[in-house]
Design a protein with these regions (language model features):
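Extended two-metal-dependent nuclease catalytic cores across DNA- and RNA-processing enzymes
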Residues: 16-169
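Non-catalytic, usually N-terminal nucleic-acid engagement modules in DNA/RNA processing proteins
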Residues: 1-11
Length: 169
C-alpha cells in the first residue's frame, strides 16, 4: 500500500511510538515486479486490511495466511509465521477475544492505549460470563464509561475500535 492508512486520521497517536528506519533494501524492486504482474497499490489501507478483505472475498476457499505480523496472525483462523517457523490456529472465539482484549489492554506496538491500569486478568474477569460478542462489546463500552468522562469514553472507545479493527470487506 502507498501512503499512510486511514487510522492516522482517526488516531494521531497511531504508531507514533515507532522509530521508522529506512525502507527495506529491495522494496522498490518488489513493488515494480508486483506491478509488472498486474498487482495494484491501494492508498489509505494497511496490508492487514487488504489481506483480510481478499480472504473475505474468497472465503469459499481454504486459506493459510503467511506473515510475521502479530496483528494479522491474531485475526486468521489459520496462519504461518515464517520468522518462528510455526503454524497458528485460532478459533473464531479466540479471534473475537483477542480483539476485545486489545480494547482493554491496548496495543503497545501500534501505540493504542486501551484503558489505563487494566490488563488481561481484568479482561478475563470482566468477560467471564459473557455469552456473545455483543455482550463483550457492551461490557467493554461500559468500562470505558466507568473510566473516562462520557464524551471522552465515546471518543476513546471509537478511536481505539477503529484503530484496532481490521477492514475485512
Amino acid at each position: 500500500t502507498e501512503g499512510k492508512c486511514f487510522r492516522y486520521t482517526i488516531n494521531s497517536e497511531y504508531k507514533a511510538n515507532r522509530k521508522y528506519l529506512n525502507q527495506p533494501k529491495y522494496l522498490d524492486e518488489v513493488k515494480e515486479r508486483l506491478k509488472a504482474y498486474g498487482f495494484t497499490s491501494i492508498s489509505g489501507y494497511e496490508a492487514d486490511d487488504l489481506v483480510m478483505s481478499f480472504k473475505a472475498q474468497y472465503s469459499q476457499f481454504e486459506s493459510i495466511i503467511v506473515s510475521p505480523d502479530k496483528d494479522i496472525l491474531g485475526i486468521c483462523e489459520k496462519s504461518f509465521n515464517p520468522r518462528k517457523m510455526e503454524f497458528n490456529y485460532h478459533s473464531e472465539e479466540e479471534i473475537v477475544e483477542n480483539f476485545w482484549k486489545s480494547m482493554i489492554v491496548g496495543d503497545t506496538a501500534d501505540n493504542i492505549k486501551g484503558i489505563p491500569g487494566k490488563g488481561p486478568a481484568f479482561f478475563k474477569n470482566l468477560t467471564f460470563n459473557a455469552d456473545d460478542e455483543e455482550s463483550i462489546r457492551t461490557l467493554i463500552f461500559d468500562e470505558y464509561i466507568n473510566h473516562f468522562a462520557e464524551y471522552e469514553a465515546i471518543k476513546e472507545f471509537t478511536k481505539n475500535y477503529l484503530s484496532l479493527k481490521i477492514v475485512d470487506t
